[in-house]
């Protein structure tokens, strides 16, 4: 075993106590995430809940509990949001790159396992195969020590460590043994710095969520004047009892609020989470489903994302010196079987040649980083070595030049050769005779090519980035259909604009540092791209966090899984197209649902304003002010089959239409004109049917019923338009919705319960006629809007 001059028996108890007192222990400071109280407050005290809460109190003041059922939406909206964010908090709080590793710490009082927070500066920590490096340090003892730093650097190959070399927290031992002295502990360690940066709380960007918030803000501004006007006119200008006035006022205010829009959006996201969960895809933030459907650039980390761990033998080229009785396949199988601690290359050979001939081993020389070869002497089959061609061959030989040519393609090349002396001889391997070149390549995930082809069809560009060498990265990219020269990231410009321009010219990048991965994401975003980052290592954490959507592999580091919005638990890259599909379903369906809810808001506000203005005009003219046409029960049944049930079904329906930006603009350009038509048509019918202050209860009920008929006809036509292009299930949604109202108006018990009276043939005829005109106007508007947006109007799919 090689020892450095700094190797010691470890610290004394007094030295340990002194370092703890000086704060030089591995106590990592608690990460800052939102508290449960902050999450609760953020989800309870929202704009939509404030609106609903005030209206609920008004309804309860009338004593009509049945009309206050919409208050349950306050609970539903809050609970769904809190559950999702608390789950995200719990995931972040569990972020621990070094996991539950128990390092073997050597001190003068003895060598034993300790928890990671007991480690102090200058502690000596022993390492063996599979052990994790828990703090940064310097190697003081080594015996063929090889460290896997792929989760930190992206470098696929294990790194041989000699005395004096540095090791970083988050890496682990592949083979050999050794010890290192802790040089950086606590928040100074490399992994701890990344963890602190990664654990800051963020929410994924969501055009749907932001758009709905903007719409709700706009609605709030409309509600204030419309609400105040309605309250004044219904309470102080009409000449009916206070309870009737309050009910009419509530009937005006309640439908102004798109009370189910936020809930339907949350349900649509939640159903997507469940569906993707069945595909072993964990969605840690609901809007991430939407986000991936909007992505136009995917930055894919090569190691662990596009490739699997390990190598595979892709070719064996026999050389001129192969005239021996032993077959190359038998020799390779025998070498693999004789290796007690195979590295990645020998494991690949063992997988390819898994039928060893059963030769008797006379001597064995394990692989050493210093010699770059391993070998076995067999009793009756000679001496065989396998290792680096540049070490075993004369650089001027034909075999060496052939190996160099193959290696330039990003492939790993090993030389199989026969030695002239036993492998345990002091002069081993002696004179070697080249027998074969064993060519290995990284294992590419079998589903990677199909997934990248899918993104290409969807016009989503893919950038392959890795800490591995550029030639190797380019070779993998080429096998996946991403052709073009790979660039060494050490030559990348540092300026954001220059970097963004360079990214447009190249597809593959090697030797990319963690901070460069982050810079690549920022540069792409600065040019207006929506960026997804896939990765599995600690070196991917910062880029995963800053990307619009972070996607981690389930087998990756705890840090990468914690900061990613989407985790592929089964490590299947091919799951991503299904996530895109779910995102499209949510985006397309919520746009339809938003049209329904906002159309209701527009016609409700307009109707309240028209009634209120009429009341204000009537006062100086000494005319009877209008009562609002509807009581809460009327607006409740109106919402059942024009919005509520259809919206729920539409929000969950299949939909693979491509997502485009401009959610708010598209919704407003349909909801506002449709709502105006419904509001005006309903008001015209009500004016024609209204009999004034001295009308009987039956006449007032008939006028309200007439207005409701017009509203239902036009609102149902909006549903019919929004449901296009038609499929059988959409027709099965629209037609029964209309039939449901026919049934309600036909049943005496329903008419009595819901305060409906369509017995006045004159007012009912007016309502039907105005309803037909309103529906025709909505149809014409739909065709005109489609032309204006440059969308081909489709009635049938």
From Swiss-Prot:
GO terms for molecular function: ATP binding; ATP hydrolysis activity; metal ion binding; P-type calcium transporter activity. GO terms for cellular component: plasma membrane. Keywords: ATP-binding, Calcium, Calcium transport, Cell membrane, Ion transport, Magnesium, Membrane, Metal-binding, Nucleotide-binding, Phosphoprotein, Translocase, Transmembrane, Transmembrane helix, Transport. The keyword Transit peptide does not apply. The active site is at 301 (4-aspartylphosphate intermediate). It is a multi-pass membrane protein. It comes from Mycobacterium tuberculosis (strain CDC 1551 / Oshkosh). It is an enzyme of class 7 (translocase). This is Calcium-transporting ATPase CtpE. Its main location: membrane. The chain crosses the membrane at residues 55-75, 215-235, 254-274, 601-621, 633-653, 667-687, 703-723, 729-749, 764-784. It catalyses: Ca(2+)(in) + ATP + H2O = Ca(2+)(out) + ADP + phosphate + H(+). It is found in: Cell membrane. Mg(2+) binds at residues 301, 303, 536. Its EC number is 7.2.2.10.
């Amino acid at each position: 075993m090689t020892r450095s001059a700094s190797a010691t028996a470890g610290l004394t108890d007094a030295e340990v106590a002194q370092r703890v007192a000086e704060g030089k222990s591995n106590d990592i400071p608690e990460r800052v995430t939102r508290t449960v109280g902050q999450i609760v407050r953020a989800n309870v005290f929202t704009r939509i809940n404030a609106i609903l809460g005030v209206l609920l109190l008004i309804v309860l003041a009338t004593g009509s509990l049945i009309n206050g059922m919409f208050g349950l939406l306050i609970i539903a909206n809050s609970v769904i949001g809190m559950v999702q964010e608390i789950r995200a908090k719990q995931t972040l709080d569990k972020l621990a790159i070094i996991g539950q590793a128990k390092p073997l710490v050597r001190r003068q009082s003895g060598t034993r396992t300790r928890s990671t927070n007991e480690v102090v500066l200058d502690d000596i920590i022993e390492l063996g195969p599979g052990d994790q490096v828990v703090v940064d340090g310097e190697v003081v003892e080594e015996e063929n020590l090889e460290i896997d730093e792929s989760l930190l650097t992206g470098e696929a190959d294990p790194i041989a460590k000699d005395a004096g070399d540095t090791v970083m927290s988050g890496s682990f031992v592949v083979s050999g043994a050794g010890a290192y002295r802790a040089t950086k502990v606590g928040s100074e360690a490399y992994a701890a710095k990344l963890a602190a940066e990664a654990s800051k709380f963020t929410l994924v960007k969501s055009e749907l969520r932001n758009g709905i918030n903007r719409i709700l803000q706009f609605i709030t501004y409309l509600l204030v004047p419309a609400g105040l006007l309605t309250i004044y006119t219904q309470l102080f200008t009409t000449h009916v009892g206070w309870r009737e006035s309050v009910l009419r006022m509530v009937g005006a205010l309640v439908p102004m609020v798109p009370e189910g829009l936020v809930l339907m959006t949350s349900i649509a996201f939640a159903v997507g989470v469940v569906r993707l969960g069945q595909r072993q895809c964990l969605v840690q933030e609901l809007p991430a489903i939407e986000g991936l459907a909007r992505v136009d650039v995917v930055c894919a980390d090569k190691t662990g994302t596009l490739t699997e761990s390990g190598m595979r033998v892709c070719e064996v080229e026999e050389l001129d010196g192969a005239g021996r009785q032993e077959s190359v396949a038998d020799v390779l199988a025998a070498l693999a079987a004789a290796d007690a601690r195979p590295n990645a290359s020998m494991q690949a050979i063992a997988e390819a040649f898994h039928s060893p001939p059963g030769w008797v081993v006379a001597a064995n020389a394990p692989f050493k980083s210093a010699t770059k070869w391993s070998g076995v002497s067999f009793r009756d089959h000679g001496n065989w070595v396998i290792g680096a061609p540049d070490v075993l061959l004369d650089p001027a030989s034909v075999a060496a030049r052939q190996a160099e040519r193959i290696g330039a393609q990003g492939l790993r090349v090993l030389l199989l050769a026969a030695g002239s002396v036993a492998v345990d001889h002091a002069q081993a391997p002696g004179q070697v005779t080249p027998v074969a070149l064993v060519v290995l390549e990284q294992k590419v995930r079998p589903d990677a090519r199909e997934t990248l082809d899918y993104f290409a069809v969807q016009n989503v560009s893919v950038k392959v980035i890795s800490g591995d060498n550029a030639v190797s990265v380019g070779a993998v990219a080429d096998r996946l259909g991403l052709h073009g020269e790979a660039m060494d990231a050490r030559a990348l410009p540092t300026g954001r604009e220059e970097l963004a321009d360079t990214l447009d010219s190249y597809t593959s990048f090697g030797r990319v540092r963690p901070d460069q991965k982050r810079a690549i994401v920022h540069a792409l975003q600065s040019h207006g791209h929506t960026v997804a980052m896939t990765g599995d290592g600690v070196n991917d954490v910062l880029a995963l966090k800053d990307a619009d959507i972070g996607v981690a592999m389930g087998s990756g580091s705890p840090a990468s899984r914690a900061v990613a919005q989407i985790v592929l638990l089964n490590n299947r890259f091919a799951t991503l197209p299904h996530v895109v599909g779910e995102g499209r379903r949510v985006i397309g369906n919520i746009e339809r649902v938003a049209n329904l809810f906002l159309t209701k808001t527009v016609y409700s506000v307009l109707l309240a304003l028209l009634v209120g203005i009429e009341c204000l005009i009537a006062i100086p003219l000494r005319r009877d002010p209008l009562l609002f046409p509807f009581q809460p029960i009327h607006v409740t049944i109106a919402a059942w089959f024009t919005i509520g049930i259809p919206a729920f079904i539409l929000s969950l329906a299949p939909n693979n239409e491509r997502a485009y930006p401009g959610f708010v603009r598209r919704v407003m350009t349909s909801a506002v004109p449709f709502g105006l038509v419904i509001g005006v048509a309903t008001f015209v019918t009500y004016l024609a049917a209204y009999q004034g202050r001295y009308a009987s209860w039956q006449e007032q009920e008939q006028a309200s019923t007439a207005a409701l008929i017009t509203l239902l006809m036009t609102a149902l036509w909006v549903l019919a338009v929004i449901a296009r292009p038609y499929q059988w299930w959409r027709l099965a949604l629209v037609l029964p919705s209309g039939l449901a109202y026919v049934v309600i108006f036909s049943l005496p018990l329903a008419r009595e319960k819901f305060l409906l009276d369509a017995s006045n043939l004159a007012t009912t005829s007016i309502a039907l006629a105005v309803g037909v005109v309103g529906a025709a106007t909505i149809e014409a508007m739909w065709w005109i809007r489609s032309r204006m947006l440059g969308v081909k109007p489709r009635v049938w799919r």
